[in-house]
């Protein structure tokens, strides 16, 4: 489930976008007002929080119809989360317990055990989709807002920063500063 759940949610986001952008209309028989209800399909936006933000970050690499994205409480780089997250359990301590890793051995994003965990989930980690966040190469890039809480215990803000920096606009911004 961990390797496919977020990818399936990204596909569901794309399918929902297709439904919304292909003349979403409520006919007068189904309308509570008795008149047809039409929606503007020119500017469709996405808001995803937590797991919705993670699946949205994946969908953003493929969906060409959504012009504005808000990814709230989402992050990339599971290795960061494994080392930083303490709620509901201290994942670093859990790893140490199951692997009998001594307290004297430092765990970091580059430790072989953490790298193995990261490799296992790379296919569904949003940080790997962030460089492709502009699928409309010929059109203007979508507007993207990534938010995180400084004290978010589920999604450490370092993971949101890592995901945002992996995006294409961050690279353009950084190269213009150098």
Question: What spans do the regions from the language model cover?
Answer:
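Extracytoplasmic/secreted proteins, especially bacterial periplasmic and envelope-associated proteins
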Residues: 8, 12-15, 54-55, 158-162
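Primarily recognizes the serine-hydrolase "nucleophile elbow" in alpha/beta-hydrolase
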Residues: 22-84
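Residue-level detector of short, conserved catalytic/binding motifs and their immediate flanks
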Residues: 11, 44, 49, 67, ...
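Generic recognition of flexible, low-complexity loop/linker segments
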Residues: 2-5, 32-35, 54-60, 126-136
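Hydrophobic alpha-helical scaffolding
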Residues: 3-6, 10, 49, 59, ...
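The feature captures the conserved acid-bearing segment of alpha/beta-hydrolase catalytic domains
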Residues: 74-178
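Cap/lid segment of the alpha/beta-hydrolase catalytic domain
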Residues: 1-23, 28-32
